[in-house]
Each structure stands twice: as C-alpha cells, then as structure tokens.
C-alpha cells in the first residue's frame, strides 16, 4: 500500500499534463463522499491504484463501466472538483513486506503514523502525505543464507536473515513468491537499508535485482505449498477459554458482544499473553482511545523468553484505523492486516491476527455499497457480505510455506463483532458464525454483574475440542474428561436454578444442592479472572488443569459422601476449610514455576480426600 504508493509517487511527483501521456490519466466525472467516478479510463483494471485530483489522493478502482471507472478514495475528498485529473499507476493496492514491521503503527493503507507525525508535526494525517511503510534510513545486519552464486532459487526461498529485535531474532528474507532464476550475485554479510540490492538473479537471459523487502497485493492470498490441519492449542491465559472453548493455532474465532462486555479486553489479553510468535492487531473502526490504550500499555508489558524479560511490543504490529479515519480505508485495513500476518506465517511463525471489530468493517462495506447504488440485503448490508467475510477468514490456517527450507507456520484470526444492542441475530454475527469454528459469546448480564471475562458458557462453543484430544492425551491425559464434567455441572445447575426459583432450594435433594454449590464455586473462582492481578492476569494451561482437577475431585468426594448417607448441610459446614482451599487455588502464583505450584495442588488433592473421609466417619 504505502509501499506501492511510495513507489508510484516517486514516478508520479505531481500530476501535470506535461509529465504524462494523455492515455495515462482520466478526468473526474462525479464525486459522492469517498466514491469518485472518473471518465476516459479505457484500459484501467479492477482494483488498480489511482491518484485522484491535484492532491494525489490515493484511490482504488472498484467498478468499470465503459470508459468510466468508479473509485473508492482512501482520503478525505473535500475540495476535489469535476474535471480534476485522475492518474493510473498500473499496479494494485499493495503492502511492503520486510524488516521493520514490528513495533510499528500503521493506518489502514500501511502509512506509518509515527513517521507522518514527525514529517507533518500534526496529530492528524494531512491529505496526500507521503511516507514509506518501511524506513529507508535504518540499516539492518544482513546475513546471507546457504544459497550461493550459481544456485537456482524460486519463490519463497530464504536467501538471508536479519536480527530485527530480541523477540524476533531471525527475520528471514524471502524471495517474492512469483520470482525465480539463478543467483548471479548475493550481498556479503553487512549492514544494508531495506531498499539496497542484496540479490541479483538471472532468468531467461534477463537480470533481476531484489532488496530485503518486496510488495504484495493485499487482496490476493499469499500462496502456500500445502494446507495442514491445525492441532496445537492457541493458549490465551484465560481459564474459561483454554479449558471449555479452546482455539487452535491456525483457527478462526468470533467474539460477539454488546458494548461494555469486554471484547477489547479479551482481544488485548490475547495479544499480551497468547503463545503466538507475532501479533497483528487491527483496530478497525473502533474508538481512538482504545488504540491509545494499546499503545500506552503494550510497551510496559513484558513476556519472558529464555529467562529474559522483553516488552511484547517487539512482537506486535498495529494497524490503527479509528472511527474518524476515512471509511474506505477501514475496508482495506482488514486486508492489510491479514497480508502482514501471512508474511510472518511464510517465515514459519505462528501469528495471531486480532480484528477489532469486523462489524465496523461490514458497516464500511454497507456505506460504499449504498453509494454505488447496489441492491441492499438484510439490514442494508450488501448481498455479498457473507462471501467477503468467508474470503477473509479463509486466509487463516496452518500451512507449509512456499520455498525451501521447509517451514510450517499458521495464521489465527480472532475477530470481535459488535452487534447493535448485543443482538446475535444481526447479519454480520450470523454470517461470521457460519464461517468461524469457535464462538466466545459475551453476555451483557454477566458484564453488569462484574463477572469477567463475561463468557456465556451455555451459548459459546468450540469445534476444535476433538482435534485437540491428541495434544491433551500426550500432555494432560484427563483434560477432556474434566472439561466435560465441568460443562455437565454447569448445565445441570442451570436447569436446577429454574426449579429453585419455583420451589426454593430446600425442596432439592442433597445431590442437587451439591451441584448448585459446586457450580457457584466454579463460576466465581474458576470462570472469573482478575486481569489486573499478578496471580490471575495470565493462567498457564498446567494451572488450569490442576484447578479443574481440584473442583471436580471436591464435587466427586461430596457426592460420594452424600451417597453413603451423609447430610450435605452438616458436611459442607464441616468441610468449609476444604471448600475455601479449593476456591483459593486461583491465588497460587504461576510465576513460582510449574513444579512448586503442582506440589501445592497435590497437597490440596490429598487434603480434600482426607477431610471428606474424616467428616463421613
């Protein structure tokens, strides 16, 4: 995008009739907000990048009709008049892929916001502003790979690597997917900027030179050798998600919820604590202060790598397209984000892309579609909404990357959806649920009760539970059984609560009372999590597993004692200390290490059995 824009601008300078052939430009015919119609555009291609007006505004052709082209403009069109020139660039909207992406914040069409601020000294983006997506001044220490002069090279092959930062130590330099040939020269190890030539290749008698970055059209998925089935969990550090509704690395997840339910908090905790190598966080049409919060918090958050503390900003790229930025760029920002994610996947990394929120993206589609006069479908959204969403989610997955050496990477998509009034029958939510495999449904009532994360366990689901059984069998053998038991206790308690409202708790049998009491315990001490504490902000999978064991063994021992004739009212009073110990297991500090915390849990399991045995004697 900005990469292509920058390259295009180098060639374009200012639009003037003397510099270009007449067939390279058209004229503006009509303007309607971000949608501009230009005439005399014969030979123009769909999705071609164009420059509109004397300010060189960036636009993209979205419809062709005779010699007229309809263009969506990614900048404010105030002041553009009929008859202004429109210049064709002959290339699609593309992003620059190379060293320097991490720790950077871009807008929806990959313009670096920090560089623009330094250049313009303004908090707003001036129209027609220019700044390359990847800094041309910074020098990177390039190390050539195993390939040498005379070797054949094809698309996706790694021909070198650079040290980007201490979290991304090995940023691989790839040959663009459609390139190939025989190496005639490769740069020796040393410091180079991203646009300096580091490789020369000959193919069919022609010489081609490549630098450390290349551009790629955002609407075209990057090719892979083979798609694989995903079978490793994407660990979020949220107990309710990791235990009951797990996602996989390479999976698709939807988080719908009304305002104030905590969608952004879940998205941000995924970025902070998930087991991903790189995070692409796309703030798509959300509030600007949420992006500001991310920018303030991320540099202060640390992850531990090989005993070193590293700020997680080093593995994060932000694409910020807030509500006050042009609508058309919001539509492009999702594609920008997924293309950046695919680039890191091609390096053999597990990437998470967080889109917050895809409802705003759909609203941008609705607005553009309305201006084009297309036939509206449900609630005014275009009829092709489902197809657009599917083509975006289809770019997720685990795959063997193109080229050699062999490497496997994955792109996981987590999309927040904000249906109006929290209504899950909204077209965006229903279309998304038909495509994604995991549904983390947020409940307004739980959020109002300050139950966070406010996941409604009765409506949420994950279709990856069976896929992950192999992982659980080799690491946590009882995990699937414990998960099913906890789900069973929660669903039974929900049915019993309706009975209690009719006849009161005293009318229930002791066994049913245990179900209700343990369900309350699970809801308050297992499903709830305090994101602002050291012990609970992130819960590792081994702590989640031991906590599940503790709750289920407490339930089983209680049921066993009641079956042997004990009275639950008396028994629960006598074993109050055990109940307190089980509920306090969330306070075990994970930073003490797995072995130490596991030893504490072993003591807890033993004390549960002892206390119930004593109380029933």
Curated annotation (Swiss-Prot):
Its main location: membrane. ATP binds at residues 257-264. InterPro entries: ATP-synt_VA_C (IPR055190), ATP-synth_a_Xtn (IPR031686), ATP_synth_asu-like_sf (IPR023366), ATPase_a/bsu_AS (IPR020003), ATPase_F1/V1/A1_a/bsu_N (IPR004100), ATPase_F1/V1/A1_a/bsu_N_sf (IPR036121), ATPase_F1/V1/A1_a/bsu_nucl-bd (IPR000194), ATPase_F1/V1_b/a_C (IPR024034). One of its GO terms (molecular function) is proton-transporting ATPase activity, rotational mechanism. It is found in: Vacuole membrane. The keyword Translocase applies. CDD domains: ATP-synt_V_A-type_alpha_C (cd18111), ATP-synt_V_A-type_alpha_N (cd18119), V_A-ATPase_A (cd01134). It catalyses: ATP + H2O + 4 H(+)(in) = ADP + phosphate + 5 H(+)(out). One of its GO terms (biological process) is intracellular lysine homeostasis. The keyword Transcription does not apply. Keywords: ATP-binding, Hydrogen ion transport, Ion transport, Membrane, Nucleotide-binding, Translocase, Transport, Vacuole. It holds the Pfam family ATP-synt_ab. Its EC number is 7.1.2.2. It is a peripheral membrane protein. It is an enzyme of class 7 (translocase). GO terms for cellular component: fungal-type vacuole membrane; vacuolar proton-transporting V-type ATPase, V1 domain. Catalytic subunit of the V1 complex of vacuolar(H+)-ATPase (V-ATPase), a multisubunit enzyme composed of a peripheral complex (V1) that hydrolyzes ATP and a membrane integral complex (V0) that translocates protons. V-ATPase is responsible for acidifying and maintaining the pH of intracellular compartments. Belongs to the ATPase alpha/beta chains family. V-ATPase is a heteromultimeric enzyme composed of a peripheral catalytic V1 complex (components A to H) attached to an integral membrane V0 proton pore complex (components: a, c, c', c'', d, e, f and VOA1). This is V-type proton ATPase catalytic subunit A. It comes from Eremothecium gossypii (strain ATCC 10895 / CBS 109.51 / FGSC 9923 / NRRL Y-1056) (Yeast).
């Amino acid at each position: 995008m900005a990469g292509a824009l920058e390259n295009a601008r180098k060639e374009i300078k200012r639009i003037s009739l003397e510099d270009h052939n007449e067939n390279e430009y058209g004229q503006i015919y009509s303007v309607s907000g971000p949608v501009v119609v230009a005439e005399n555009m014969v030979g123009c291609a769909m999705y071609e990048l164009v420059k509109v007006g004397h300010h060189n505004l960036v636009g993209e052709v979205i419809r062709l009709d005779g010699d007229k082209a309809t263009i969506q403009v990614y900048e404010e069109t105030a002041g553009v008049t009929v008859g202004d020139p429109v210049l064709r660039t002959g290339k699609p909207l593309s992003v620059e892929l190379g060293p320097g992406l991490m720790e950077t914040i871009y807008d929806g069409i990959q313009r670096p916001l920090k560089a623009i601020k330094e250049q313009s000294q303004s908090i707003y983006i001036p129209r027609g502003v220019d700044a390359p997506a990847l800094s041309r001044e910074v020098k990177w220490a390039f190390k050539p790979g195993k390939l040498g002069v005379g070797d054949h090279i094809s698309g996706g092959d790694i021909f070198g690597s650079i040290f980007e930062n201490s979290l991304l130590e090995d940023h691989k330099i790839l040959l663009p997917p459609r390139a190939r040939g025989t190496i005639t020269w490769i740069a020796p190890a040393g410091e180079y900027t991203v646009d300096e030539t580091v490789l020369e290749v000959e193919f069919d008698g022609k010489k081609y030179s490549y630098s450390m970055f290349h551009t790629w059209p955002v609407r075209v998925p990057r090719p892979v050798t083979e798609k694989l089935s995903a079978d490793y969990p994407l660990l979020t550090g949220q107990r309710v998600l990791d235990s009951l509704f797990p996602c996989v690395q390479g999976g698709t997840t939807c988080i719908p919820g009304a305002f104030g339910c905590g969608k952004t908090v879940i998205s941000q905790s995924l970025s902070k604590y998930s087991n991903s190598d790189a995070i692409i966080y796309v703030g798509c049409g959300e509030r600007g202060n949420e992006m500001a919060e991310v920018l303030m918090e991320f540099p202060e958050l640390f992850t531990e790598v090989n005993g070193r503390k590293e700020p997680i900003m080093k593995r994060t790229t932000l694409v910020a397209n807030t509500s006050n930025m042009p609508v058309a760029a919001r539509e492009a920002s999702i594609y920008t984000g997924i293309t950046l994610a695919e680039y890191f996947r091609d390096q053999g990394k597990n990437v998470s892309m967080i889109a917050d929120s895809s409802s705003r993206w759909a609203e941008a589609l609705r607005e553009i579609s309305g201006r084009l006069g297309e036939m509206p479908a449900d609630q005014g959204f275009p009829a092709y909404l489902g197809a657009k969403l599917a083509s975006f989610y289809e770019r997720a997955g685990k795959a063997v990357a193109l080229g050699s050496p062999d490497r496997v990477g994955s792109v996981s998509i987590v999309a927040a959806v904000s249906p109006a009034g929290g209504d899950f029958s909204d077209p965006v939510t229903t279309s998304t649920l038909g495509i994604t495999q995991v549904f983390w449904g947020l409940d307004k009532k739980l959020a109002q009760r300050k139950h966070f994360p406010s996941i409604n366990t009765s409506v949420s689901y994950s279709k990856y539970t069976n896929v992950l059984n192999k992982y659980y069998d080799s690491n946590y053998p009882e995990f699937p059984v414990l998960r099913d038991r906890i789900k069973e206790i929660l669903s039974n308690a929900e049915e019993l609560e309706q009975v209690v409202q009719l006849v009161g708790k005293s009318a229930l049998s002791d066994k049913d009372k245990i179900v209700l009491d343990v369900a309350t315990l699970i809801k308050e001490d297992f499903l709830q999590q305090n994101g602002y504490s050291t012990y609970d902000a992130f819960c590792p999978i081994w702590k989640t597993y031991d906590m599940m064991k503790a709750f289920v063994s407490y339930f089983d021992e209680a049921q066993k004692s009641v079956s042997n004739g004990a009275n639950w009212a008396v028994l629960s009073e006598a074993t109050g200390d055990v109940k307190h110990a089980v509920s306090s297991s969330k306070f075990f500090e994970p930073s003490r290490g797995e072995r130490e915390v596991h030893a504490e849990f072993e003591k807890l399991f033993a004390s549960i059995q002892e206390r119930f045995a004593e109380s029933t004697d």
